[in-house]
């Protein structure tokens, strides 16, 4: 099971039918195919079960898991530059003149095409969890751009995807700052030992601390001086640890050993059964975590 490491949370802002069988057909039209000799990158859907499955959707209890794979050809800039300079020098010597910029740009395209078949590939995978019960979509990545790119592929596959980032009623950084200032958190949450504080003014500086008692005079002085907590390490129910950011993203998810080992009684050879059990467990825990976190931060903004 690919336990999520990050959560970028989006709200489906109107009801759309997300039927697994129909989705399967829609995603299949955009399934992953490797780069051809002249492709710089390719993205498409793969089975969440990897080599152990063929279906592009994994569905349980109204929860849908899908995975996008991206292949990128790696062409380091110095390699392109060296090949381009050699080609320019050769042509300028042959023609006894300096090449124009437009000619050099055209040559660069030629160089890229000649190098692509020999380029190494880098593969990455981004999983998307669709919670049809709560009308939420979660993307397992740390970058908003990567999340948006993955959702763009999903939108293209489905034809429509009315989602917006989950927004809260109150600024998150104000709530995080108050938690650190007072040392008092809502039930179920506990401060850990890592935070980032930023000055309200752009040139006012950033403080990052690790392995630090956050309820102390030093941190209090920074808050008193006008800095706000923009990232905060938290423990939830002694089951999940995370970094909560002021943009609403949740990063560096760490599930407790008790959680991860809960389904160890399932035969290891039953890959699908274990995957399914872990998916049910993970989505149940994360749905509760998201709900508790939104409530602790003052609730979702009215739409």
Swiss-Prot record:
Is Signal a UniProt keyword of this protein?
no
The record's listing under NCBIfam families reads: PRK00321.1-1 (NF001460), PRK00321.1-3 (NF001462), PRK00321.1-5 (NF001464)
Role summary: May be involved in recombination.
This protein is called what?
A: Recombination-associated protein RdgC
Pfam family of the protein (one): RdgC
What are its GO cellular component terms? Answer: bacterial nucleoid; cytoplasm
Annotated GO biological processes are: DNA recombination; regulation of DNA recombination
Location in the cell: Cytoplasm, Nucleoid
Q: Which family does it belong to?
A: Belongs to the RdgC family.
Primary place of residence? cytoplasm
Q: Which UniProt keywords apply?
A: Cytoplasm, DNA recombination
Q: Which GO terms describe its molecular function?
A: double-stranded DNA binding
